[in-house]
Amino acid sequence: MVQRVVDRDYYDILNISVDADGDTIKKSYRRLAILYHPDKNRENPEAAREKFQKLAEAYQVLSDPKLREKYDKLGKVGAVPDAGFEDAFEFFKNLFGGDSFRDYVGELNLLKELCKMINEEPELKAIEDTEESKKQLQREESKEADRLLQERIDVLCKNLLDKLSIWTETDMSDRVTDAFKQKMQFEAELLKDESFGNEMLHAIGSTYVQRANILIQSQSFLGIRGVWGSLCAKGTLLKDTWNTVVSAVDVQSSAAALAKAEEGEEQWSKEKRDEAARELTGKVLSATWKGTRFEVQSVIRTVSDKILYDKAVPLEKRINRANALLMIGQVFLKVAPNEKSDANYFEDLMNDRGK
């Protein structure tokens, strides 16, 4: 027997039954939050922002047993959280690793810009929107972006040097080496439990290994292996760039098809629309992750190269840095995700639907 509630609105917003369990509520919210993110619905940003915030509001109430009980008995008025409703966009700030990876990559610009762009209220412009004013604004924004990026790189270089010094500023004996690897293994095991933690570790680890090997192998006979490694790295970069663009185009195409079906232009059954929505969610995740991975690896390359090719530092010490970086990268690449972990929900959705 289905329980009686005084208000079904929150349940309808999340597309769940009134007797849905906590796991069902969480999964439905996560899927809908990805699908209806305002950045994917730019034709009507105000309506999209409102819908997105309602999703977060419904989830905050129904995911809390005490608030849910109040809502079922009293409706929305009786179920307002003591601290008010959370910002829906905080969800996206923690989508790829959150603060746990900040020491490695800083604040991710892609997600920051998505949240900033959608969260800002439209403002009346005080000056005429001329071509010249647009160019001036672009120049100012570009200059500020360059400044922030340089600050970010400087901080990340210091963070990485501090981490490498745990090994490089010692006698680098077998005992110290084993302890260093164990420390990094312990850190990696904690990081992998974050949202997209395993993917983040592999993106960072593969770049560490790549950059470290290029320097180490450049010291071999004629440096041929180092040159080859550099060429392979450029090929990987081109491939990743292409895949990122293709994913974005695929999302636009799928979103347009689903929009037509929702508006009744295409005669799709409910089952077909639901399946298309699930597939689109996976594709959105896949495209967003590829863009994020591109940014992560770009930053990691810049930081790694800056500390490995600092001419003010003796070559021997830079080689030691490369060896420490190589060890961290290898540890990160060996990390495997927890089977059937709730933290892997997004990854599973992306891998199932975003191919």
From Swiss-Prot:
Q: Which InterPro entries match?
A: DnaJ_domain (IPR001623), DnaJ_domain_CS (IPR018253), DnaJ_X (IPR026894), J_dom_sf (IPR036869)
Does ATP-binding show up as a keyword for this record?
Answer: no
Keywords for the protein's UniProt record, in alphabetical order: Chaperone, Cytoplasm
Q: Which GO terms describe its cellular component?
A: cytosol; mitochondrion
Chief place of localization: cytoplasm
**In its UniProt record, which GO terms are filed under biological process?**
protein import into peroxisome matrix; protein insertion into mitochondrial outer membrane
What GO MF terms are annotated? Hsp70 protein binding
Q: Where would I find the J domain in this sequence?
A: 9-75
UniProt-annotated location(s): Cytoplasm
Which Pfam family, giving just one, matches this sequence? DnaJ-X
Family label: Belongs to the DnaJ family.
PANTHER family, per database record? DNAJ SUBFAMILY A MEMBER 2
Specify the protein name. Uncharacterized J domain-containing protein C3E7.11c
Organism expressing this protein natively: Schizosaccharomyces pombe (strain 972 / ATCC 24843) (Fission yeast)
